[in-house]
Swiss-Prot record:
Residue intervals on the Lumenal side: 1-50, 103-117
Listed name of the protein: Transmembrane protein 170A
Residues listed as glycosylation sites in the UniProt record: N31, N37
Subcellular location: Endoplasmic reticulum membrane; Nucleus envelope
Keywords, sorted A to Z: Endoplasmic reticulum, Glycoprotein, Membrane, Nucleus, Transmembrane, Transmembrane helix
Gene Ontology cellular-component annotations: endoplasmic reticulum membrane; nuclear envelope
Recorded topology in the membrane: Multi-pass membrane protein
Family: Belongs to the TMEM170 family.
Organism in which the protein naturally occurs: Danio rerio
Residue numbers on the Cytoplasmic membrane side: 72-81, 139-145
Highest taxon, organism lineage: Eukaryota
Underlying gene: tmem170a
Amino acid sequence: MIEALIVGEMQDVQIGFVKQILSLNLVPRSNNTTCGNNTSLCDFSEMWYGVFLWAVVSSLIFHLPAALLALATLRRHKVARFFPLGILLMGIIGPLFGGVLTSAAIAGVYKAAGKSMFSLEALVFGVGQSLFIFIISFLRILATL
């Protein structure tokens, strides 16, 4: 009888603990820190990497079709057949140099504000960087015409 009471009290304590944890919405991370939920990026390196990764991927998504189009149209040209390589290199080198700094600045602002970043925010900031570069590049070309 006493054992049944002890087991019942332990189950009540465990249920109360689970409710408390779920109400706080804290999920333990791999490095023993806690974060708002499992898709939140709390650490500076997580935020930086998330934004940087989306910037690189979206830059390649913009540059790969341009390189394929250049390859298809310039394949018989004597010198310009190598332009697609330059386009692909700029699709990789641009985010490696510029994207590293801007992603670090975004992650630094979030970390200094004490906020966590959702994965969707990292996507928006990463793709936003590539869109911004695309728009600026397009406007520079229009200015030369």
